[in-house]
């Protein structure tokens, strides 16, 4: 069953965040991730929205997600995002295919 990683990001240090982006794609594609949306200006329908970017990523399985997120390569670049931005994220299960 596929799963979706959703991240709401508020960037506070663009230069440090760029270091994260510079290394992210190479690691990401190695673990079967697929960007479905990266949006800096979503349409807010309800509530307040104080984020710079919203990201939606699909993984074929939760195992693929875990292998990516917990990989030494990703953990090495993750430190840049943690320094540069506030991020609220979650993992949700897809519907049976």
Residue ranges and their predicted role:
Residues 1-54, 58-70, 74, 93-97:
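Short S/T/G/P-rich N-terminal loop/turn motif that feeds into the first structured element of a domain
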Residues 68-86:
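Electropositive, surface-exposed helix/loop patches at the edges of structured domains
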Residues 82-97:
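C-terminal end-helix/capping segment
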């Amino acid at each position: 069953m596929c799963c979706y990683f959703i991240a709401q990001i508020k960037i506070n240090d663009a230069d440090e965040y760029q270091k994260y982006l510079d290394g992210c794609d190479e690691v990401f594609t190695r673990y079967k991730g697929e960007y479905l949306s990266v949006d800096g200006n979503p349409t807010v329908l309800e509530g307040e929205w104080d984020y710079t970017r919203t990201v939606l990523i699909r993984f074929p399985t939760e195992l693929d997600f875990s292998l990516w997120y917990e990989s030494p390569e990703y953990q090495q670049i993750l430190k840049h995002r943690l320094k540069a931005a506030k991020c609220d994220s979650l993992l949700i299960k897809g519907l049976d295919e």
